Amino acid sequence: MATLKDVAKLANCDISTVSRALNNSAPVHPETRARIMEAVKTLGYKPNMVARGLKMGRRNLIAFVSPTIRLNIFSDLSVEIQREAEKQGYQTLIINSKADAVNEAKCLNELRSIADGIIIASTGRNNRLLREIEGDGTAVVQLIRKQDENISSVISNYYDTSKEAMHFLYKKGCRHIGILHGNENVKPFADRLKGYRKVAKELHLPEIISGNDALGVPGFMDGVNGTKHLLELDPALDAILAETDLQGLGALRALKELGIPCPEQIKIISLTGFSLGPMLETAMTSMAMPSPEMGRAALRLLLDRIEAKDRRPPLQHIVFNASLTERETT
């Protein structure tokens, strides 16, 4: 692997001149700079971004704090954030808070001294701590879960997403539409339920709701048990909105166990659209969030704040729309 000394030797100049040219820390004669850049290209020299960041008062390290790293949209987001951060010379820590407020606070307090910035899908229980961390100079961006209006965020329009899904199912002839719900203190779940209730009221449909109090991301067994609960609430159930793909997968399993055909008797739509959906034996219809674009947008916001130096960029809240992709479950 080529070193700074190798570049200096090939460019016929001293190491300090190479360092100034690469860091733009002081003027370098154009001809000398050209020789240095040609030497860098010839040798395939890669600067040590961590060391370079430390000299500039940065560590070139960001963190993504997620409530889970199981099969769900957060898996997609972590891959995208890590890929894009690497292109910009940043290393990424992926942290699983386990959707536990105490564990989340512990992680955040450790990260505030080592990371330049934090992207977080939070529990909503540590908003004051996040504001303190940002006030101390560590950039913070909320992703998926906008739990604090005073911190920049990237989210999807969860309210309109559930409304669109409800209208789609209604046009399919469904009149007893249930929802596998998450914790109402978590913004995406709360907004989806509001959209569901809005359309149910407009169309004079019954509300059939199976809730979940956990702060985490509802999973497979939540879908299995929730579907059975929905059928207990209304045996005429003819459609299910699943807030996550794993809930939807659990719903499919429950219907299979009960001998209920999908989509002939009960249709299912996932309101998240994780990449797992199309891979299922019965491919799932979904309101797909554009996770690659959302991950990149969150990273851009974070890097803007990290690299702003003395000025503080204005607060930004970016909202993406989900798109309906019809598959076999409807």
What are the residue ranges of the model-derived segments?
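Short gly/ser/thr-rich secondary-structure transition/capping motifs
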Residues: 42-48, 100-102, 121-123, 224, ...
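Amphipathic helical "hinge" segments at domain boundaries
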Residues: 45-107, 114
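Short beta->alpha connector loops
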Residues: 98-101, 121-126, 147, 246
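N-terminal helix-turn-helix DNA-binding module of bacterial transcription factors
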Residues: 1-59
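Active-site-adjacent beta->alpha loops and helix N-cap segments on the catalytic face
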Residues: 125-135
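Non-catalytic positions within long, well-ordered alpha-helices that form the structural scaffold/packing
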Residues: 105, 111-112, 170-173
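Bacterial carbohydrate/catabolite-sensing allosteric modules
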Residues: 42, 80-91, 117, 135-142, ...
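Phosphate- and divalent-cation-binding pockets in alpha/beta enzyme and binding domains
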Residues: 73-76, 103, 128-129, 195, ...
